[in-house]
UniProtKB/Swiss-Prot annotation:
One of its GO terms (biological process) is response to stress. ATP binds at residues 252-259. CDD domains: RecA-like_BCS1. It comes from Arabidopsis thaliana. This is AAA-ATPase At4g30250. Residues 315-335, 467-519 are annotated as: Disordered. Keywords: ATP-binding, Hydrolase, Magnesium, Nucleotide-binding, Signal.
Length: 519
């Protein structure tokens, strides 16, 4: 036994000596080239072929990586793979906030087997730690992630032709089946995180739909038809040479349902929402970076664009270089103005209708404002904001929808006299759907009480509005009378000097005549 350990010690000493000699004699570059050569030789004589699918491709996220990750994380695929693989496969389980399902995934540097058309395919989740860099122009993730696909060489055509397309299609199907959309917001100052993501996301679970949306049915129908034609119009946009995008401008008083309409659009189309906060974007370059990182089939929203940044009527707050700085009255929430932050109007226009707006496809831009008269006309023209949707005060059809949503009351369930009162008052009351909803929520347990209070509120608003209109008319009449009196005084003031001049001139003429008579 002692001879065995003596032999092992001698062998280890010999290996250590040889390693030291190799490191001293051969430079690192030569050793690395030799290892690469050995790897290539091994691949030549190997019966398998390998494909690497990295998470990040240059500056962009690899969509194929996301598709593979979603495909492998589906519970059905994982169960099938585990049953056909060895029992040592390690899976990671995650559940993100607001999600209704548990997500499966491969652990770091673990493998899983998939079967496609009778062909066995091996997937490996490769995670490599990056070396710490003392300086870098762009932050890099601490880990380099990717999937390695291993198949037999004779099955190469199968993978390239159909398997990857199958994975992409399956991932889209899984996502539609899960019905989980994402709501994104831009990071402060577009500071890219470790994985080059300028957007932070949460699960989007807004219940608003076009069925529950309180607005005119005809207007709602036109919007749904326009959205449907857009989603199915890939061939049309390609044939006409137009970018596959659409712009909507929602304008109207606060509380009229602009945000609810955006949520209903996302639920109707199954699109993600990117809520762009312009006050967090410092310049046009960062605006382009944000657009580059948005996905297809998404709605890009800028709410209250007239308040977010001073991009209203041209000529106001304009610098010499043509840019529009933040309004000094607008702060970052802490009471401090962002120094040196500016986005030009041309940058925003190019964001919606320039070359950069073609990044990706099937995108919808939605701007909202409470004061459309403040916006620059260049921002509202067709091609940028294709459809202008006025979100006005609550009308009788919208009121009936709210009664159905909150109280489960149909038109035939209500007294015709009460309905007539509502129909007569709601137009003149100028009440928002949000105010009506608040009354119904307070009394949702008692439908009769809710209806009585709605009628009472509508009548009170009508009386107040009539009084307000009457006061305005009286004020206008008073102003008109004052203006007339002032004009009359001005005329008198102008006439009095002329009259004096005439009197003086007449008196002088009489004196001259008397002097002539005396002579």
């Amino acid at each position: 036994m002692s001879d065995y350990w003596t032999t092992m010690a001698s062998l280890l000493g010999m290996l250590a000596f040889c390693q030291t000699i190799v490191q001293l004699v051969f430079p690192p570059e030569l050793r690395l080239a030799f290892l690469h050569f050995l790897t290539r030789i091994r691949h030549v004589f190997s019966s398998h072929i390998y494909f690497d699918i990295t998470e990040i491709d240059g500056v962009n996220t690899n969509e194929l990586y996301n598709a593979v990750q979603l495909y492998l994380s589906s519970s059905v695929t994982v169960n099938d793979a585990v049953s056909s693989s060895n029992n040592n496969t390690r899976l990671s389980l995650t559940r993100v906030p607001n999600s209704s399902s548990v997500t499966f995934g491969l652990s770091n540097n673990d493998r899983i087997t998939d079967v496609f058309n009778g062909v066995t395919i091996l997937w490996e989740h490769v995670v490599v730690q990056r070396q710490v860099q003392s300086f870098s122009w762009r932050p890099m993730p601490e880990e380099k992630r990717g999937f390695t696909l291993q198949i037999n060489k004779r099955d190469k055509a199968l993978v390239l032709d159909s398997y990857l397309d199958y994975i992409v299609g399956k991932s889209e199907e899984i996502r539609r089946r899960n019905e989980e959309r994402l709501l994104y917001t831009n990071s402060r100052g577009v500071s890219l995180d470790a994985r080059s993501h300028p957007w932070d996301s949460v699960r989007f679970k807004h219940p608003s739909t076009f069925d529950t949306l309180a607005m005119d049915p005809e207007k709602k129908k036109r919007i749904m038809e326009d959205l449907r034609e857009f989603a199915n119009g890939q061939g049309f946009y390609q044939k006409t040479g137009r970018a596959w995008k659409r712009g909507y401008l929602l304008y109207g008083p606060p509380g009229t349902g602009k945000s609810s309409l955006i949520a209903a659009m996302a639920n109707y189309l199954g699109y993600d929402i990117y809520d762009l906060e312009l006050t967090e974007v410092q310049n046009n370059s960062e605006l382009r970076k944000l657009l580059m990182k948005t996905s297809s089939k998404s709605i890009i929203v800028i709410e209250d664009i007239d308040c977010s940044i001073s991009l209203t009527k041209r000529g106001k707050n304009k610098k010499k270089n043509g840019s529009y700085e933040y309004d000094p009255g607008l702060t970052n929430g802490s009471g401090l103005e962002e120094p040196g932050s500016s986005v030009t109007l041309s940058g925003l226009l190019n964001f919606t209708d320039g070359l950069w707006s073609c990044c990706g496809s099937e995108k919808i831009f939605v701007f909202t404002t409470n004061h459309i008269e403040k916006l620059d006309s260049a921002l509202m023209r067709s091609g940028r904001m294709d459809m202008h949707v006025h979100m006005g005060f609550c009308k009788f059809p919208a009121l009936k929808i709210l009664l159905k949503n909150y109280l489960r009351l149909e038109e035939e369930d209500m007294d015709s006299v009460v309905l007539k009162e509502m129909e007569e008052c709601v137009e003149e009351a100028e009440i928002t759907p949000a105010d009506v909803s608040e009354v119904l929520i307070r009394n949702r347990s008692d439908a009769e009480k809710a209806v009585r209070e709605i009628v009472s509120v509508l009548k009170e608003r009508v009386v107040k509005r009539r009084k307000s209109v009457g006061l305005k008319k009286k004020k206008q009449e008073g102003q008109e009378e004052e203006e007339e009196a002032e004009e009359e005084q001005e005329k008198r003031a102008l006439d009095s000097p002329n009259r004096r001049n005439r009197e003086v001139c007449g008196f002088r003429e009489e004196e001259e005549e008397e002097d002539e008579k005396e002579k």
